[in-house]
Amino acid sequence: MFRSLWHTIGSSLDRYRTYPRIVGETGGKDFIVAHRSADVEALAVAMVRGAYEYQGQKCSAASRAYIPSNLWPRVKERMLAMLAEIKMGDVSDFRNFMGAVIDKKAFDRIKGYLDEARTKPGVTFVAGGKCDDSKGWFIEPTILQVEDPKYRTMCEEIFGPVLTVHVYADTKWEETLHLVDTTSPYALTGAVFAQDRSAQETANRVLRNAAGNYYINDKPTGAVVGQQPFGGARASGTNDKAGSILNLIRWVSPRLVKETMVPPKDYKYPFLGAE
């Protein structure tokens, strides 16, 4: 839709007195990538909170994760333990961590991804996958593990409680970072988990353009309005950082005014008469 709007505006430039400005924040395929030095407990909590808060119906929700082979067994164990405790139900009851997805259209779309995943080799349901629309539109918090890092649910925004995990060889840190950077057209949010400072710096460099809001050792969602300017680039929008002066400037046309108090009275510059 945003591309269509921009195309329509661009094709109508002759109607405007100046080049119109457009600000957009569209969506994301937000990532968590963990180094072999990551804190397992912090990582598992971030994956659960980041993927399943608000049923994953946030443009910043974690929806793809890259976990090293040395950590995955422990991370999976901790996530499964937490998911076993999670309650779903009426969101007015604060004992419930999750509620229903927003409507039948969303329910059917998310269910479609899960139904397709069941038919694909190399895709494993680690947790969840059940859908129930008998009363409301409820989808279990789901973890998919995929062998193919370019599988559909690693690339496309689902906007639901589905987290897809690719387990990589723990010696291939930089190669995996390049994979993260090139897999999705979006660049909204992302998180890196590493206690190794050198690994963090490598990630900062490789993922320079992969996320407009970039988190280190924290979940990639939950930017506080008025405290953390928010926005992303690539297919995620114009990265004008809502909640900051950068966004405000996009809505105004700056003008510089110069007033000369002592104007020159001779066209010749001083250097023109120099010997």
Predicted features, each with a name:
Residues M1-P149, T171-W173, H178-T182, I216, ...:
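ALDH superfamily catalytic-core signature
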Residues P161:
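Glycine-rich nucleotide-phosphate-binding loops and adjacent flexible coil segments
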